């Protein structure tokens, strides 16, 4: 079994903001597959599906970004999913808008959602699908991550969302992190 979790903040106020890149990516995947998040438990919206013959949990934590680990760890513990079978979709300010990078493990890079997951899973050894939102140029970090993408930026993100569907499918199919990094980084 695999868990794919997109990170973001709940509520319409945060809908379509840069910090909700994880939610937007997972929503794109769900839309492409004709699926929806039909359960509310483990402090998240989620669904359990069979995709290409594999059991998969698709999750959007509803704890706010900084406490995402609570939701991810609750569902991983309940379904007995090992951390290496977890893929977290996150925004990354250290990469250009729409750039994708796969990581098999590592520190949080200052991302509070990832810090929370490391704390609550008790390990850094889980997979990440990072999508760039770049650092702000003439505004604060908080203002930057809580604003939507402009039209030009959104086109780059749409390409990233399309590529992410392939990455998620490869992860579900059991492709290891080294394969994913070689193919998509």
Curated annotation (Swiss-Prot):
The record marks 91 as: Stabilizes the basic form of H active site to accept a proton. GO terms for molecular function: peptidyl-tRNA hydrolase activity; tRNA binding. It is an enzyme of class 3 (hydrolase). PROSITE patterns: PEPT_TRNA_HYDROL_1 (PS01195). It catalyses: an N-acyl-L-alpha-aminoacyl-tRNA + H2O = an N-acyl-L-amino acid + a tRNA + H(+). GO terms for cellular component: cytoplasm. CDD domains: PTH. TRNA binds at residues 14, 64, 66, 112. The active site is at 19 (proton acceptor). GO terms for biological process: protein quality control for misfolded or incompletely synthesized proteins; rescue of stalled ribosome. Its EC number is 3.1.1.29. Keywords: Cytoplasm, Hydrolase, RNA-binding, tRNA-binding. InterPro entries: Pept_tRNA_hydro, Pept_tRNA_hydro_CS, Pept_tRNA_hydro_sf. It is found in: Cytoplasm. It comes from the Bacteria. Monomer. Belongs to the PTH family. HAMAP family: Pept_tRNA_hydro_bact (MF_00083). Hydrolyzes ribosome-free peptidyl-tRNAs (with 1 or more amino acids incorporated), which drop off the ribosome during protein synthesis, or as a result of ribosome stalling. Catalyzes the release of premature peptidyl moieties from peptidyl-tRNA molecules trapped in stalled 50S ribosomal subunits, and thus maintains levels of free tRNAs and 50S ribosomes. This is Peptidyl-tRNA hydrolase. It comes from Lactobacillus helveticus (strain DPC 4571).
């Amino acid at each position: 079994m695999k868990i794919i979790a997109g990170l973001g903040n709940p509520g319409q106020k945060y809908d379509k903001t840069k910090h909700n890149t994880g939610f937007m990516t997972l929503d794109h995947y769900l839309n492409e597959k004709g699926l929806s998040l039909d359960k509310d438990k483990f402090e998240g919206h989620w669904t359990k599906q069979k995709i290409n013959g594999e059991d998969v949990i698709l999750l959007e934590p509803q704890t706010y970004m900084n406490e995402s680990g609570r939701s991810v760890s609750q569902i991983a513990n309940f379904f007995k999913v090992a951390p290496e079978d977890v893929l977290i979709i996150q925004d990354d300010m250290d990469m250009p808008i729409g750039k994708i990078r796969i990581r098999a493990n590592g520190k949080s890079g200052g991302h509070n959602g990832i810090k929370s997951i490391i704390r609550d899973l008790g390990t850094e050894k889980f997979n990440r699908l990072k999508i760039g939102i770049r650092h702000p140029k003439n505004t604060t970090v908080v203002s930057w991550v809580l604003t939507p993408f402009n039209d030009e930026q959104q086109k780059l993100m749409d390409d990233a969302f399309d590529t992410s569907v392939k990455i998620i499918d490869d992860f579900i199919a059991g492709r290891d992190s080294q394969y994913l990094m070689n193919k998509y980084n």
